[in-house]
């Protein structure tokens, strides 16, 4: 009987922290759809090459525009 209670106690203690911690809804990782709607100006995009004035061909799929190809 004691071993069953011990197993139940361990299971409850392991599961409690996973369900008791409130999730922070303000994190960008929690809102991918909202993050994708934000329009980054081309000049400030991290894949924008200031010397060439355009993004590389590989950056087109990542959302950098204009693509010069």
Curated annotation (Swiss-Prot):
Residues 1-20 form the signal peptide. Mostly non-hydroxylated. The modification 4-hydroxyproline is found at residue 66. Residues 21-52 form a propeptide. GO terms for cellular component: extracellular region. Expressed by the venom duct. Belongs to the conotoxin M family. Mu-conotoxins block voltage-gated sodium channels (Nav). This is Mu-onotoxin-like Am3.2.
